[in-house]
Amino acid sequence: MSLRLPSLSFTWLTRLSWSWRFTWVYLTLILFIPIIALFLKSASLPLGRIWELATQPVAVAAYEVTFGLSLAAAALNGVFGVIIAWVLTRYDFPGKKLFDSFIDLPFALPTAVAGLTLATVYSDKGWIGQFIAPFGVQIAFTRWGVLLAMVFISLPFVVRTVEPLLLELEVEAEEAAASLGASPSETFWRVILPPILPGVLAGVAQGFSRAVGEFGSVVIISGNLPFDDLIAPVLIFERLEQYDYAGATVIGSVLLLFSLVILFVINALQNWSSRYNG
Amino acid sequence: MVAFVKARRQIAGVKESKSLLPLALIGISLLYVGLIIIIPAANVAVQAFSEGLSGFIKNLGDRNLQEAIRLTLLMGVISVPLNTLFGLAAAFAIARKQFPGKSLLLSVIDLPFSISPVVAGLMIVLLYGRNGWLGPLLESNDIKIIFAWPGMALATIFVSMPFVAREVIPNLEEIGTDAEEAASTLGANGWQTFWRVTLPSIKWSMLYGVVLTTARALGEFGAVSVVSGSITGKTQTLPLFVEEAYKQYQTTLSYTAALLLGGISLVTLVLKALLEARTGRQSRIH
């Protein structure tokens, strides 16, 4: 008996070891070789040229717009995401199920459609834009539009990471805090927020990462003006259209490096979150 | 007023709270999601029918739109089976083994989700484009990948790669090996065990992954846009068609294509909810 079990599971694995080989071949062809192609292309340029291309003023302005607005969008969704997750886990109201499924729409709706409809609704004559235009604020084709598109596509992340954490939270702790005389805001800051904070931050980081890389919705709603509302992915696209492969590659490598760093951060936050919640 | 608030609170199912807080929080949530998601979503349908049903049907007959539909379906037909196969293979290779670097490998599989679609497309251009690493080799053999469907398919495969793997891996870890070992003991070979025991127990998570893969494959814009050149009627998928028609001021035509894509995403959400109900799991996004 003691011999049988290991040998059984072992034959099972060896018989399916095609899976191991297939996985590596597929990853190599689809993922590794393209990534290496990008870095090799960057590395084939002289170091000074790389620096020059990576830090040219139009690129630096594009990084600022991209990272700044993505961070703003992620932070906004951090605040509202917690509220929405709270509402979904604690309250009942008519149409809640429908409301719940709308949260996932940004994830299912193609980004081009999102950009198109946001650009229409928030244009000067659009359903919502017409009420904002009199205040002198134009949303479509400005930085506000870019921010709006980024808010749209990164909205689900915080909601969906915080929801399960709120479900696990013990209501007793809140009730105890309240019965000991804590105000709702004290209860929130001292009792509710600490255990969900790593999850909130992980969701914010995911949303941030998604917003930084976003192209489809932003390119449609943005005016794509350099030094104004041009984001880095659109700049890469334009460089490619002008057959400036070196420029596209270097800016692309900057974004890729950023993705790798933020992936590491998200992993660390998720580990922290799961440790926190046992 | 007091009666009204009381009634609202009962609807909200909050009885002991004396404050207006729940109502306010529900209101804020509805307003936020309404302004950012629900109203824009409703706008897609309204705009698509802005010339009435007959206008919508006439637009559906547009030759370039139909070509875009065909190409979009082709992207799905190519990338969904391949990525499903990969997801299953990766799950079998990884899920039940403990080895150093396992969590790193799982992160690597997730990489396409964190790489900007434009950068993904750029990588494929640098590899297969005319000035790319394999460019001369492909050109001398008369194989066209960039500005043609094979490159678009590669881009689509890239961006939708992780879905099945990341759904099936945790599922496979969860179900354990008892049933398979029993099947083996009863004389089933590897493939019999796979088809009769393993596959049925992971089919829902696999389907969940397939639904998400399909939605992404049919809706991808950035990566496909970079490699396709977006030539109307030739290398234009539906999402590219949406942008192009909008830029050409054919707004209603653009919204016709957008509504088709919106319909796909509605179906996705419904299937997703059904599968979540069946597997009893929380909604997850990527």
From Swiss-Prot, chain A:
InterPro entries the record matches: CysT_permease, MetI-like, MetI-like_sf, Sulph_transpt2
ABC transmembrane type-1 domain mapped to chain residues: 63-266
Residues that span the membrane, as ranges: 22-42, 67-87, 102-122, 139-159, 188-208, 217-237, 246-266
Molecular functions (GO terms): ABC-type sulfate transporter activity
Keywords, ordered alphabetically: Cell inner membrane, Cell membrane, Membrane, Stress response, Sulfate transport, Transmembrane, Transmembrane helix, Transport
Membrane topology note: Multi-pass membrane protein
Alphabetized Pfam families for the sequence: BPD_transp_1 (PF00528)
Compartments reported by the entry: Cell inner membrane
PROSITE patterns xref list: ABC_TM1
Assembly mode: The complex is composed of two ATP-binding proteins (CysA), two transmembrane proteins (CysT and CysW) and a solute-binding protein (CysP).
NCBIfam families documented for this protein: 3a0106s02 (TIGR00969), permease_CysT (TIGR02139)
Family recorded in the similarity comment: Belongs to the binding-protein-dependent transport system permease family. CysTW subfamily.
Name of the molecule in the record: Sulfate transport system permease protein CysT
The encoding gene: cysT
UniProtKB/Swiss-Prot annotation, chain B:
Family membership: Belongs to the binding-protein-dependent transport system permease family. CysTW subfamily.
Highest taxon above the source species: Bacteria
Membrane topology of this protein: Multi-pass membrane protein
Cited InterPro entries: CysW_permease, MetI-like, MetI-like_sf, Sulph_transpt2
PANTHER family: SULFATE TRANSPORT SYSTEM PERMEASE PROTEIN, SULFATE TRANSPORT SYSTEM PERMEASE PROTEIN CYSW
A GO term for molecular function: ABC-type sulfate transporter activity
Location of the protein in the cell: Cell inner membrane
UniProt-listed CDD domains: TM_PBP2
GO cellular component: plasma membrane
Transmembrane segments: 20-40, 74-94, 108-128, 145-165, 207-227, 255-275
Keywords attached to this entry: Cell inner membrane, Cell membrane, Membrane, Stress response, Sulfate transport, Transmembrane, Transmembrane helix, Transport
Function: Part of the ABC transporter complex CysAWTP (TC 3.A.1.6.1) involved in sulfate/thiosulfate import. Probably responsible for the translocation of the substrate across the membrane.
Inducers of expression: By sulfur deprivation.
Every ABC transmembrane type-1 domain range: 69-272
Protein name: Sulfate transport system permease protein CysW
